[in-house]
Amino acid sequence: MATQQRPFHLVVFGASGFTGQFVTEEVAREQVSPERTSHLPWAVAGRSREKLLRVLERAAMKLGRPTLSSEVGIIICDITNPASLDEMAKQATVVLNCVGPYRFYGEPVIKACIENGTSCIDISGEPQFLELMYWKYHEKAAEKGVYIIGSSGFDSIPADLGVIYTRNKMNGTLTAVESFLTISSGPEGLCVHDGTWKSAVYGFGDKSNLKKLRNESDMKPVPIVGPKLKRRWPISYCRELNSYSIPFLGADVSVVKRTQRYLHENLEQSPVQYAAYINVGGITSVIKLMFAGLFFLFFVRFGIGRQLLIKFTWLFSFGYFSKQGPTQKQIDASSFTMTFFGQGFSQGVSPVKNKPNIRICTQVKGPEAGYVSTSIAMVQAAMILLNDASDLPKAGGVFTPGAAFSRTKLIDRLNEHGIEFSVISSTEV
């Protein structure tokens, strides 16, 4: 992608937010990466110069780079001020948007980026926002030749590219995949910043509008190849991983389905069915999550209930979410593993009347999911936009990560930066 002689190749918008601080650190690492062959001019953007400077100073101390603050531009920008968003977009080739919940704050950034010929990457895990932005802005982005790529953090690059990786590694036709997410933590346990909790509360509280949006889109169904993938019970046991699991309620399924539609309709690839689950451990964890889930699903239906869920986040989430977010010790001790079980047909075997005769198991592993892996994924996606434009879809538009990056070297870059893709087993039966 041409940098268009703009002052900054990258601008991190919302750099002083909880997630934005991690993205800022990751861009700073990329700036001095031994692999870089050219200078990476970049900036941070937000409402407060003082807060942005503090973020840069903390990153400088952590990375041992005392001159970092003087190397990075600062742009004062407010989500409620469209003119300031325009000024930010005009100075960037790619904006990394870290300001959420995106259902409230994401659209003005996308609009400003498209109008000013700037590409944009976000880390939204909100299906309604992601799908609505496609319908509203895909054609406009294509006309401008810019790339708007959502869900480019832990939601949903590991899942979306994990399915593509599994397809690429199968010697035949992949027809169905189940993924199982395992989150590991240290002695201090897990914690997630309440921004993620708020996005979930608002998303579940507005599910009817997502259903309405999908009905109005009136898209023809993607064909099912091979046997239809059976959905598991709300609580099921995964023998291969020796753990109980529940359906994963994030954006992964929505994103992967949209990617598979794109690959089928635009690249004539055989579509893959997909289901996502998260491992919750033993029966004690199952009972605890059942209570938390029942409370959540009851209260999220009502306006006052949503207010209570947001006001008393720590209580209703059983301590998994907090306004302070995880400590550095919790982050350092956390990691994730996403295991993919795929099935399909070897070359020459028709999926019409036969049973699947190939099984494949792959994994994506990485450091702490919500902030460390998210930052790595987001920044490496931006590097692809800047450096590998020839492998992107020829026209711009609004894309899922898989649709945008399926033919790029993003998986290779992620492997080099600590998010590892691997084949565990592959058998023909």
Swiss-Prot record:
<dbReference type="InterPro" id="IPR036291">
    <property type="entry name" value="NAD(P)-bd_dom_sf"/>
</dbReference>
<comment type="similarity">
    <text>Belongs to the saccharopine dehydrogenase family.</text>
</comment>
<dbReference type="Pfam" id="PF03435">
    <property type="entry name" value="Sacchrp_dh_NADP"/>
</dbReference>
<feature type="modified residue" description="Phosphoserine">
    <location>
        <position position="217"/>
    </location>
</feature>
<dbReference type="InterPro" id="IPR051276">
    <property type="entry name" value="Saccharopine_DH-like_oxidrdct"/>
</dbReference>
<keyword id="KW-0007">Acetylation</keyword>
<dbReference type="GO" id="GO:0005811">
    <property type="term" value="C:lipid droplet"/>
</dbReference>
<dbReference type="GO" id="GO:0009247">
    <property type="term" value="P:glycolipid biosynthetic process"/>
</dbReference>
<protein>
    <recommendedName>
        <fullName>Saccharopine dehydrogenase-like oxidoreductase</fullName>
        <ecNumber>1.-.-.-</ecNumber>
    </recommendedName>
</protein>
<dbReference type="InterPro" id="IPR005097">
    <property type="entry name" value="Sacchrp_dh_NADP-bd"/>
</dbReference>
<dbReference type="GO" id="GO:0016020">
    <property type="term" value="C:membrane"/>
</dbReference>
<feature type="modified residue" description="N-acetylalanine">
    <location>
        <position position="2"/>
    </location>
</feature>
<dbReference type="GO" id="GO:0016491">
    <property type="term" value="F:oxidoreductase activity"/>
</dbReference>
<keyword id="KW-0597">Phosphoprotein</keyword>
<keyword id="KW-0560">Oxidoreductase</keyword>
